[in-house]
Amino acid sequence: MKCEKKGNLVNRQVTVGQEDLEQINRLTRREFSQEELYCFRVVLCDNDVDRQMERFDEETLEQLARMFVGKTGICDHQPKTANQLARIYQAQVEYFPGKTNLLGEPYCAVVAKAYMVRTESNRDLILEIEAGIKKEVSVGCSIRESRCS
C-alpha cells in the first residue's frame, strides 16, 4: 500500500545558526557558509486524517522524523538528478497549541528544516518559496500493513 501526505511551509526562511551549519555540513562534501545556503522549515506530515481517511499516529511520526533526515526533496515526484532541489537536515515532531486534528486530538506534525545552495538556477524558486507561491510538499511512503485505529 502506498500513501501520500501533504504538508506546507511553516515560514519563509530559517536563520542559519552554527548548529544548523554543522548539521548541514555533515551531509555535504565540502563545508558551506551561511551566505551560500537558503534554509526553510516545512511540515512534511501530521496526525490529521487525510483524504484517504488515513492518519499517522504520534509514534509513527516520531519514527518518520528520524528517517527523513538526509533525504532529498525532489520536484514533481520525478526522481531525476535535475529534480533534486533541497535536502532535509533536521526533523522533529512539533505540537501546535490550541490546534486539534479532525478527531479532536492535539495536532502534531513532523516539521523539517531543509537547505538549498543559493545558485543562479534556483534564485526564482527561492523567491517563489518566500512569496508563498511554492508552499506545499507531498511525502510518499510505503507501509507493510494497514490497521484500523
What are these language model-derived features?
Residues 1-149:
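Signature of dsDNA virion morphogenesis modules
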